[in-house]
């Protein structure tokens, strides 16, 4: 089971092993279930496009997740 830090923030390094799509989908599914959200709908939306869509969708539903990256293209996804 995943737990959030005391300040209710989870950090994911998109440049590391936890930045892969399978990890992000699994994390989103667990967070959605813990929050009483529709995990199937969220993960289907995450999978409906490319990797950029996946991280944008995760950011949309889980604003308490902080994504770290050195990739400027990924950073643009969060500022668009």
Model segments located where?
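Long, contiguous binding/interaction regions
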Residues: 1-80
């Amino acid at each position: 089971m995943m737990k959030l830090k005391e300040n209710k923030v989870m950090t994911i390094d998109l440049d590391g092993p936890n930045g892969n799509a399978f990890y992000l989908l699994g994390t989103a599914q667990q967070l959605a279930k813990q929050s009483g959200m529709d995990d199937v709908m969220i993960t289907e939306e995450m999978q409906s496009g490319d990797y950029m869509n996946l991280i944008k969708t995760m950011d949309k539903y889980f604003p308490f997740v902080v994504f770290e990256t050195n990739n400027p293209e990924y950073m643009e996804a969060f500022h668009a």
